A protein has these predicted regions:
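Structural preference for beta-strand elements that scaffold enzyme active sites
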Residues: 12-14, 38-42, 68-72, 86-89, ...
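Glycine-rich phosphate-binding active-site loops on the catalytic face of alpha/beta enzymes
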Residues: 15, 90-100, 132-144, 175-208
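Active-site mouth loops of central-metabolism enzymes
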Residues: 9-27, 108-115, 165-166, 170
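Glycine/Thr-rich beta-alpha phosphate-binding loop at enzyme active sites
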Residues: 82-92, 111-158, 195-203
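Short secondary-structure boundary segments
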Residues: 19, 45, 92, 113-115, ...
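Alpha-helix-loop-beta-strand connector modules within alpha/beta enzyme cores
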Residues: 54-73, 94, 99-116, 145-171, ...
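Catalytic cores of alpha/beta
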Residues: 32, 71-86, 115-127, 159-166, ...
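Catalytic domains of carbohydrate-active enzymes, especially glycoside hydrolases
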Residues: 29-44, 126
Length: 208
């Protein structure tokens, strides 16, 4: 997990893509990453073909490189390998970490741990590069099956110094509390991409 321990406190955002890539997305992404608050960008497209994800992925990867943001692929280790992305995020039902390592070697592999210390311990044992816990709040991006709490975050911090990503409905009204409780990265999607009041770049500017 040493790859990302040298993180920059100002870059606390782990940005997740909208579920559909519209044509103004690329311009918005540049404006968002330009704010220098993002450490990771995760491409999470459930409905596109491999080929389409490859085309979109290449465009996004260029933008991420320009702004020194790590480019992570959700679920699809083969896509991560093909794109030579910086890493892959695996859910509990996705490919196992050992299999993923065979494909992408020393790249970043993050693991969804829901609200479970037991899952976190397994991920730590398997040398995950970061642990993702959630949902901390109700989310518009994903149905909430697991509810995570600040006490869970504190427990996880006691057992590991592997970076922790917190996820689930994070927005301007609740992000500060997670930072104060020393979450390393905040996974954010809907607040940036589906904000009815603010453009993406203005939404991210408010998070300081």
């Amino acid at each position: 997990g040493q790859k990302i321990l040298r993180y920059n406190k100002k870059r606390f955002i782990y940005l997740i893509s909208p579920s559909k890539i519209e044509k103004n997305f690329f311009k918005n992404l540049k404006e968002v990453l330009k704010q220098k608050k993002t450490s990771f960008f995760q491409l999470r497209l459930k409905k596109n073909s491999f080929k389409k994800k490859l085309i979109i992925g290449r465009k996004i990867q260029k933008i991420c490189k320009k702004f020194k943001v790590k480019f992570i692929i959700n679920d699809d280790v083969y896509l991560a390998k093909k794109l030579n992305a910086d890493g892959c995020h695996l859910g509990q039902s996705d490919m196992k970490i050992r299999e993923a390592r065979k494909l992408i070697g020393k790249k970043i592999i993050g693991i969804t741990c829901h609200n479970s210390i037991k899952l976190a311990k397994t991920a730590i044992k398997n040398k995950a590069d970061y642990l993702a816990f959630g949902a901390f709040n109700l989310s518009k991006t994903k149905k909430v099956k697991y509810k995570a709490s600040i006490s869970l975050l504190k427990k996880a911090q006691k057992i590991t110094n592997t970076p922790i990503v917190v996820i689930g409905g994070i927005n301007f009204n609740n992000y500060k509390n997670l930072l104060l409780n020393k979450a390393n990265f905040l996974a954010i999607s809907g607040y940036i991409w589906k904000n009815k009041k603010l453009k993406p770049k203005n939404a991210i500017k408010k998070l300081i």
